Amino acid sequence: MKDSERGKEEMKKYISIDIGGTAIKYGIVSENAEVLLKKEMKTEAQKGGPAILEKVIGIVEELKDEADTGVCISTAGMVDIEKGEIFYSAPLIPNYIGTAFKKTVEERFGIPCEVENDVNCAGLAEYKAGAAAGSKAAVMLTIGTGIGGCILLNGEVFHGFSNSACEVGYMHMDDSDFQTLGAASILTKKVAAWKEEPTENWSGYHIFEEAKKGDEICNRAIDEMVDVLGKGIANICYVVNPEVVVLGGGIMAQEAFLKDKIEKAVE
């Protein structure tokens, strides 16, 4: 056996699982953060927390012979990181509160398991190998159906007193909250209402494509969203004083169109 092959055999390998509202993405990751295997399955969120736990058990059963160093789970919802358990979740996944991933995996397979909120995981990834690398203080925001946040201090997630720090989507703003006014989902609602068309006629991608062609209503909706994002990010900066703010989520596929607008709104 070649030394390189022997090194790979001896390398620590982890089962990595990301639980999203639509898909569960999973695979094997090395101790050097190299993705060795990548797969996915449908979440079927409507079936609830117990069904998702069964999917996780199935994934660990499938991969445990190839990667037995540990199981890492990234998930939506608020996570008690000591217990590895969901203690708050939006209605998207019924009966998700109380889902005990860590206890179940460790008792059943004897493999160490850690569970963390998905936005916090995104923030850690940005610190380890992305836009926040080397920063002393950073904020990660994901902008999608809602708005999630993560504070990183010297590369460590700041969880707060009860593991619910930086839930910025619920931040009060203009008689509403940050994510109701500033998340990407607001775009389709506004454009459809202003054009008096069904919401299903519009997607975020469609809105940005029309905005680039000069559509006034699409540009107005984007500008209003950007204004809200600017105010929210500025408020967070007043409190945290970060060295860098990293934006993620599906909407940032439009970075070339949005970056200058958002930076100007924050200023």
Which residues does each PLM region occupy?
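Short beta-strand scaffold segments in enzyme catalytic cores
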Residues: 24-28, 147-152
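A cytosolic small-molecule/anion-sensing beta-strand core signal
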Residues: 30, 75, 153-154
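Short beta-strand segments
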Residues: 18, 72-76, 140-146, 150
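Short loop/edge segments at beta-strand edges and connector loops
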Residues: 115-119
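ATP-binding/phosphotransfer module of carbohydrate and carboxylate kinases, centering on a glycine-rich
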Residues: 2-70, 80-85, 105-113, 125-137, ...
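A charged helix-plus-loop insertion that forms the helical arch/lid used to bind
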Residues: 85-98
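Short hydrophobic alpha-helix segments
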Residues: 39-41, 90, 161
